[in-house]
Amino acid sequence: MKEKKTKRRVWRGVATTGTSLLALSLSASMVIDTFRTDIDKFLGTQSTQMVTDNQTEDDYTYKSDYSSTTELLDSIEDLGERMSEEGTVLLKNNGALPLSADEKKKVTFLGFSSYFPIQGGDFGSSLVENKGTDADTVDMVQAFEAKGYSLNPTVQQMYEGMKEDFKSEAVLPWGVVTYYRATAPAVGGTFTSLEPSQEKLDKAEPTWKDSMNDYNVMIVTIARAAGENANYTPGEEGVNPEQNLNQADPLGLSDTERATIDAAVKAKAENGGKVIVLLNNASAMEIDELKNNDGIDAMLEVGIPGGYGFYGVADVLSGDANPSGHLADTYAVDNSASPAAQNYGDYEWTNADSDYSINSEIVEAESIYAGYKYYETRYVDTVLGQGNASDSVGSSTGGAWTYNSEVS
């Protein structure tokens, strides 16, 4: 009996030890495999080897077209500049452009977006800055100065001193991101204009209007951001009601933006200068009042230029490049009058679960007739006298629908 008990204890000990070693081995294997790369680096070993048939030395060698990193960065900068030159659209020019060499030396930037422009999307296609490289990304001020423009220092210091007033937030799926520029409202939200009032500007710098006598080429930038998870609700519903800025649509002008343009037009009447409007946006704006404003000498759509595109904008204004771009969207007189705007909104499900970030939908009932397809098709129908196309439904004037009254 004693011998049997001894054997049992031995086997139990062996089994326990074996089980422990097996568990330790499995755990160690998983740990080693997880940190295999670091262990190989430390020991100077190699865990894997890739073997292919007919392998040659250059099979997996990428051959660059550039001889150095500097040359690569210069090429990226050049591409960004040329894209902006070729994509800029000249919407209006009453003999104001191109600017002469003398006019380049007396430029006033107006509008906070001249100093804090939109260069990328709020979420996706956002600006990736290069700093401390051979091709640093530049904003509008830096680009124009690099191209030989002289800017009104009084107005520049005024706007840059108000930087904190231009802080805005973009609501992204993982949280809120802060920008110092215009941002688009979240889906279902309202647009808030950050353009400062004339009273605020006068308080910040009482002499800013007088300073334009010496810098009488006035460039006003109007901006609207864009991005994923952000949209503009058409009509007054999409505008912050607390501001009371006589803004009929988030993509239309606010009274503070109108006042900035009016200040430039008034200064021009006194100093004999020029007024140029730049549209810095990725969403088609309501620009009819800008087009019809005789005080505005030129207007350009510059889009969202990225890290180097403002070099190209500066070249377009001076005539060193031609604005060969064409609009990719229809610029409607009234965005809210189009069929696509009728079903737009943030319509949540009745049984929405707050734990999920997507609880809404939009019913697209207009089929393919969105944007230019709607306007061009309805125009043809008015010419042919069919489909009740001349009816007042969808007319921004309240009268018979006409193409020229609906498209800027």
PLM regions: where:
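C-terminal non-catalytic regions of proteins with extracellular/luminal or membrane-system context
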Residues: M1-S408
